[in-house]
Amino acid sequence: MSNDEGETFATEQTTQQVFQKLGSNMENRVCFDCGNKNPTWTSVPFGVMLCIQCSAVHRNMGVHITFVKSSTLDKWTINNLRRFKLGGNHKARDFFLKNNGKQLLNTANVDAKTKYTSPVAKKYKIHLDKKVQKDMELYPSELVLNGQDSSDSPLDTDSDASRSTSKENSVDDFFSNWQKPSSNSSSKLNVNTGSLAPKNNTTGSTPKTTVTKTRSSILTASRKKPVLNSQDKKKHSILSSSRKPTRLTAKKVDKSQAEDLFDQFKKEAQQEKEDEFTNSSSSTKIRQNDYDSQFMNNSKGNNNNSIDDINTQPDEFNDFLNDTSNSFDTTRKEQQDTLTPKFAKLGFGMTMNDANDLAKQQKESQKIAQGPRYTGRIAERYGTQKAISSDQLFGRGSFDEAANREAHDKLKTFDNATSISSSSYFGEDKEVDEFGNPINSSGSGAGNFDGRNSNNGFIDFNASADDELQMLRDVVEQGAEKLGSYLRDYLRK
């Protein structure tokens, strides 16, 4: 499909392949200007990926500097896709770094117009135009995606023909420089190693006593290192291939040879033990001789009596020397025993502890963690009361259990009474007149006489009527309260 100017549009599948291949590089997954992730807009002249905010900045610069397109929404021509086939954020960044444009790659405090009108940006634009022109000459009417396009460096301006010739030359040089190892190398090695045999010591000096250890023929043959002359060494140039690394090969050993090797190893171990024992015994003898010489030198300055005493007790002196040597050997053995690692023989779990103490500590910790348990005694005892004090709860302070019990007993006698007086509560005796009515503190009968009519001697009937009305009023109020509470409970249901 083509437009009026003759430009060929690419299919959506080709466009997706180009940008998917471009997104395989991590540097192409961020904006080239600000560093935001997942950019979907592009600067076509420079072949870089941009975010939507930076695309607005590029759109304001002008088409003579740059123009933007969406990688997912717009249609793309083949020539525009060539710039992203051969470009990308990673190649533009490499070009800027290698051409003194590092300060322009900073994502902050860099003007976009200054960045894209700089000499480095202009050089990169010209460089990308040349690469696009070469690709158009190779593939004029189609877009071919090769694996080499993403690996080409931005500074590589040589032609593809020169690259192919250089590759062919490098291959020819590699195979021309390759040389097979000569078959007579083993014979040369044998001759040279034979010439390096040690010469016999012709001097008159006596060699020091050393412990000679026999080695197996197989081990010595495998450990020999070949020695090459200067003529046999290969000269490697810079253009030639790298040296072939030497490989270590293992030789097969027969069963009989393996048994001989094990026997030889045992003999060598026994020989080493014997040598250590002889060295230790020789050291003890040398020390004993030193003690003898020192003792003889000290004995010369003493008087004759001391000499006679020493001569009479030679056995004790020899025993002393033997004891010192034995003590030295024992101390050495003790040091060896302390240095050798040993496992302590313990019980289950290989830990030293006291199970009883641990169990007690665990029980105490559980008790502390649990705290006091709720038994319900407090609710049973004080559930009907409206309030209690801490002294009453714990039985301390001004609280008296006997007085409290007596008060409860007195209150039980007034369970059915509507009202009580202090005299009836405390059990005080009331004065009664001749009619059996209680007498007030004023001296007149409260039920029969009033203070106003005490002089006339008549009975006041109004007082009794008022009392009856008051009682009737109280009964009505109580009934109304009960009826109201009943209706309230009914409505709540």
From Swiss-Prot:
Residues 278-296 have a biased composition (Polar residues). A zinc finger (C4-type) spans 31-54. One of its GO terms (molecular function) is GTPase activator activity. Keywords: Golgi apparatus, GTPase activation, Metal-binding, Phosphoprotein, Protein transport, Transport, Zinc, Zinc-finger. Residues 176-192, 199-217, 297-311 have a biased composition (Low complexity). The modification Phosphoserine is found at residues 170, 306, 389, 398. Residues 16-137 form the Arf-GAP domain. It is found in: Golgi apparatus. PROSITE patterns: ARFGAP. The keyword Transport applies. Present with 1510 molecules/cell in log phase SD medium. This is ADP-ribosylation factor GTPase-activating protein GLO3. The gene is GLO3.
